[in-house]
Amino acid sequence: MLELPLKTDFTGKVVVVTGAGGVLCGDMARAFAQAGAKVAALDLNEDKVKKLAEELKNEGFVCEGYAANVLEAEQVKAVHARILEDLGKCDILINGAGGNNKRATTDNEYQHEAKAGQTTFFDLDTEGVDFVFRLNFQG
């Protein structure tokens, strides 16, 4: 059974957390920092990930925040180089980036007959669905 905070000592380990601007992955980043890890927090939302990194640093932990779109290989490569320089080689990767997109969501998932103006499966934006697929499967 997992006990929080983490009881394992991660001192000296570099933990990279994608999606760290969100609630779940932000808490994972915080837990690893509290357990002694040097944390690289990545997120598409630069403001959120920089705020998390600042909070953890103010609490005495080692954390760097990086803005990156995990669907863009060049951004990931650039952030990887910065992490190597700032914190060292990644020991643990929490590949937590994911989510949904309004363009890939229907108005009512259990509706049998669509009402005028409601988005059904057949009305979904293919680019929105593709974005969600790539983010959650490839990202």
Short names for language-model regions:
Residues 63-65:
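Hydrophobic/aromatic anchor residues within beta-strands of the central parallel beta-sheet
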Residues 104-130:
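Substrate-binding pocket helix/loop in short-chain dehydrogenase/reductase
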Residues 23, 96, 100-104:
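Active-site beta-alpha loop architecture of Rossmann-like, nucleotide-cofactor-dependent enzymes
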